[in-house]
A protein has these predicted regions:
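N-terminal alpha-helical "arm" segments
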Residues: 1-30
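Basic, alpha-helical nucleic-acid-binding regions used in initiation and control of genome expression
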Residues: 12, 70, 74, 278-281
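Charged, alpha-helical interface segments at or near domain boundaries
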Residues: 22-216
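Short amphipathic alpha-helix segments
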Residues: 226-240
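A short linear hydrophobic-aromatic micro-motif
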Residues: 244-248
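C-terminal structured domain segments
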Residues: 251-287
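TerminUS-proximal long segments
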Residues: 275-311
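Non-Sec secretion/translocation targeting segments of pathogen effectors
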Residues: 316, 320-374
Length: 374
């Protein structure tokens, strides 16, 4: 677009002298769920890590009346502001190839498998039902956010480790970031009145005393915490805490909501709720999925809630058909046995006796039906 090219051609006028020889590039960057953004990279000297400044929000301001040169100035300001962090990260670049130094910085990221096929093509990925997990190295984590690089297949090969090793170390690093299961009511109260919601993960709740049974699973930083859902022992803890099976609502990449299966919630209604919230409340790149999950308390097995209901219906129908088939099989076998015995005993000309035996056969059939509840 003309706006992006104008920014590229004029941004040097707003930058310090050290950027005069910078080879400025525009690039399309694919983010979560197929969202594509336009970014600009402006190197400073021989710096190896170059921050990307995304232009899409500025373009929206431009089409709503903001002066184009003011937008260019904003891009320059953002690039200068990012320089300090880029220099800090640049110092750690040699360590990126040292797996022992990086493994504690790993983090699991989770997304909808169907929504992100192209984006995941070059990355280390593990599949978990409806979800795909990919992995990142968090070079810096603070209250303002996370600076990270994705774990690509080529980086894994440089490390000389397996996918399984990366997954195990990333899950351990995620646990070390803190696992939190909190009551949604307490979260709302803390936002209004202050205070910190209680972590319920190791508690055993009396659900009859919980007025609105809805809980949030995330990490201490509330950043990329939904991936904790993939850890079996955490799902087991949640089941023990609630004392029941539970539904998992994929609210965003940062957290998931947990609802006990208490007979109140219906899967079609939950799916509709998630889809509506995604469309109206959650930014596209932060949406996790629109597929509600069900988790069994005893086994900690998680599966698509809608497909689970369909599977149970199918199993129930098959079981019912099998029961019916078994009863009718017994009837046919009894009839065949009676016919075989009487054929040996009864002369063909004794029609009255045969009629009596037929009545006896009918009575036996009726008795079998009665005993089977049919």
């Amino acid at each position: 677009k003309e706006f992006y090219e104008y920014v590229k051609d004029n941004v040097k006028e707003y930058l310090p002298e050290s950027y005069k020889d910078a080879e400025i590039k525009l690039q399309e960057v694919e983010k979560n769920n197929g969202l594509k953004l336009t970014g600009i990279t402006i190197p400073n000297g021989d710096q190896r890590i170059v921050p990307t400044v995304y232009l899409d929000s500025l373009y929206q301001e431009y089409i709503h009346g903001k002066d184009v040169d003011s937008c260019v100035g904003d891009v320059a300001d953002m690039r200068i502001e990012a320089q300090g962090k880029a220099e800090f990260l640049d110092m750690g670049v040699p360590d990126i190839l040292d797996y022992e130094k990086m493994k504690n910085k790993l983090q699991v990221r989770i997304c909808d498998k169907e929504w992100n096929t192209d984006r995941l093509a070059d990355k280390v990925v593990t599949e978990h039902g409806d979800f795909a997990a990919y992995y990142a190295v968090n070079l810096e984590e603070n209250g303002e956010g996370i600076s990270s690089i994705p774990v690509t297949v080529s980086l894994m090969n440089e490390w000389g480790v397996s996918v399984e090793q990366i997954q195990a170390d990333a899950m351990m690093a995620d646990k070390n970031r803190g696992v939190q299961l909190v009551d949604m009511t307490q979260i709302v109260e803390s936002m209004i009145f202050g205070g910190t919601p209680k972590n319920l993960l190791n508690e055993k709740l009396d659900m009859e005393t919980v007025e609105n049974p809805m809980f949030c699973l995330t990490n201490e930083s509330k950043m990329n915490g939904a991936s904790l859902l993939l850890q079996e022992d955490i799902r087991k803890q949640i089941g023990e805490c609630l004392g029941s099976d539970f539904f998992v609502i994929p609210s965003s990449v940062h957290e998931v909501l947990i609802l006990p299966d208490n007979g109140i919630f219906q899967v079609p209604e939950l799916n509709a709720m998630v889809q509506e919230v995604n469309e109206t409340q959650v930014e596209r790149q932060e949406q996790l999925s629109d597929k509600v999950q069900f988790c069994d308390k005893k086994t900690a097995v998680m599966e698509n809630a809608e497909r689970r209901e369909a599977r149970l219906e199918k199993e129930k129908a098959a079981e019912k058909a099998e029961v019916k088939g078994g009863i009718h099989g017994r009837l046919e076998k009894a009839k065949a046995e009676i016919k075989a015995k009487e054929a040996d005993k009864v002369p063909k000309n004794k029609s009255k006796e045969l009629e009596a035996l037929t009545d006896k056969n009918k009575k036996l059939m009726n008795d079998i039906f009665k005993s089977s509840g049919l």
